Amino acid sequence: MRYAIMVTGAAYGTQQASSALQFAHALLNEGHELASVFFYREGVYNANLLTSPASDEYDLVRAWQKLNTQHGVALNICVAAALRRGIIDETEAGRLGLPSANLQPGFTLSGLGALAEASLTCDRVVQF
């Protein structure tokens, strides 16, 4: 089956993002296709390059990036939610006159159209 995941919880402070990542790995291990992960609302914090967990904590942000590089899973974050929460890429930083970007490599700023497309092209969309 072809799946998409929507994550609405931040990388730390809730169980949503880590549960979503575990579910993503379980899907891939069982031979399913994971087309994309869409980060919405507080979920956009999963794409913050500046997140720096303690050395004895799991680095969830880099784990998402690893999912992208190893399995080619698209990591889309809602551009409107991201901008409201201070997550920006180089293009938006330049457009807004900000000194730097903080979007983790592997993630892409996207509109809700990416979520709509995933809903139309996947057999299941699972929200965390």
UniProtKB/Swiss-Prot annotation:
GO terms classed as biological process: tRNA wobble position uridine thiolation
EC number(s) per entry: 2.8.1.-
Keyword Transferase: yes
Keywords per UniProt: Cytoplasm, Transferase, tRNA processing
Family: Belongs to the DsrE/TusD family.
Quaternary structure note: Heterohexamer, formed by a dimer of trimers. The hexameric TusBCD complex contains 2 copies each of TusB, TusC and TusD. The TusBCD complex interacts with TusE.
Main function: Part of a sulfur-relay system required for 2-thiolation of 5-methylaminomethyl-2-thiouridine (mnm(5)s(2)U) at tRNA wobble positions. Accepts sulfur from TusA and transfers it in turn to TusE.
Name by which UniProt lists this protein: Sulfurtransferase TusD
